[in-house]
């Protein structure tokens, strides 16, 4: 735990707050399961670029993926198709490790109110360590000279603790990175249904408001 910050952050749509309190944090894949979305509609949402912010049949909202055009992904993916990358990131719950990245995402959400969950990392690891992974890049952005990426981008937490980014650099053919290179994202595969037991603080952000240091 000494190699991770004491807390991480999750930015959620304020409209989804009742669902989060009931069911915890769910990946897009899990949200589609919960809402009963199937067939071609599900395929479009889960395995292609979402150009619009969506409201599912149960009222839960799913954000667009405008920074992830398929053509840009095709140029930077290793051993994967764009549809597979969309499926991979839609199967995970994402956390930011610093407020600057969170605030950049918040700006991309425009005027929609947001809720920030501040998460205790020690509690998160205790509950979800076996399903946690770390990424050194913003996996949801492929604009402006996108970084090479693939399945190895998400390094399992236990592996990262022991050997840093070595599996990513080997798997993607990258230059070896220092073990101290900070992660950009922390992910939990599938869902984090009891995330409220890991929450230390909650911030409600009105339209245009950013998260500030305490």
Report residues per predicted region.
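A structural/positional concept
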Residues: 1-31
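Conserved NAD+-utilizing ADP-ribose enzyme module
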Residues: 1-6, 18, 36-93, 97-214
């Amino acid at each position: 735990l000494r190699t991770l910050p004491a807390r991480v952050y999750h930015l959620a749509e304020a409209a989804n707050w009742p669902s989060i309190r009931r069911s915890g944090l769910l990946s897009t894949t899990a949200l589609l399961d919960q809402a009963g979305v199937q067939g071609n509609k599900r395929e479009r949402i889960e395995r292609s670029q979402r150009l619009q912010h969506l409201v599912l049949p149960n009222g839960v909202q799913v954000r667009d993926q405008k920074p992830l055009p398929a053509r840009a992904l095709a140029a930077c993916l290793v051993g994967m198709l764009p549809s597979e990358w969309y499926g991979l990131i839609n199967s995970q719950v994402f956390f930011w490790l610093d407020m600057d990245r969170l605030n950049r995402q918040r700006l991309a959400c425009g005027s929609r109110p947001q809720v920030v969950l501040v998460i205790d990392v020690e509690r998160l690891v205790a509950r979800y360590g076996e399903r946690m992974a770390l990424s050194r890049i913003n996996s949801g952005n492929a604009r402006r000279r996108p970084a090479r990426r693939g399945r190895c981008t998400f390094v399992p937490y236990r592996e990262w603790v022991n050997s840093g980014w070595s599996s990513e650099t080997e798997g993607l053919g990258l230059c070896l990175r220092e073990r101290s290179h900070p992660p950009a994202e922390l992910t939990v595969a599938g869902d984090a249904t009891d995330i409220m037991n890991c929450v230390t603080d909650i911030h409600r952000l009105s339209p245009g408001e950013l998260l500030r240091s305490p």
